[in-house]
């Protein structure tokens, strides 16, 4: 079962002591079309998860996101959890994060970067 986190809760966790790692798992074509990402996120190709999932630290919290929080990020989070990782997917993906952040005070310039 895939577990999720909404943009508001993620924002709170990112300012906490044990902030999760952020992994952008948009398909390569989506990422290349719009390379903006949540600050400090790393992009990983979801189609090559076998190549990178074992490099992640076990037990460390991670949040993955795709464009809309659909099947891409959900399937990657499921796969990560099968490897024993504490993985959540971002509800609504980067689209929801961006829409949510535009109304947040002072965060819009920090939230997305190229």
Where are these predicted regions, by residue range?
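Rhodanese-like catalytic fold shared by cysteine-dependent sulfurtransferases
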Residues: 1-21, 28-63, 68-114
């Amino acid at each position: 079962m895939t577990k999720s986190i909404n943009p508001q809760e993620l924002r709170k966790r990112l300012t906490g002591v044990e902030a999760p790692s952020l992994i952008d798992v948009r398909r390569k074509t989506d990422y290349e079309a719009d390379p903006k990402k949540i600050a400090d996120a790393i992009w990983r190709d979801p189609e090559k998860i076998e190549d990178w999932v074992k490099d992640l630290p076990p037990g460390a919290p991670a949040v993955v996101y795709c464009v809309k929080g659909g099947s891409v990020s959900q399937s990657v989070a499921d796969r990560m959890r099968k490897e024993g990782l504490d993985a959540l997917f971002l509800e609504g993906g980067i689209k929801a994060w961006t829409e949510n952040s535009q109304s947040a005070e002072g965060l819009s310039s920090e939230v997305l970067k190229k």
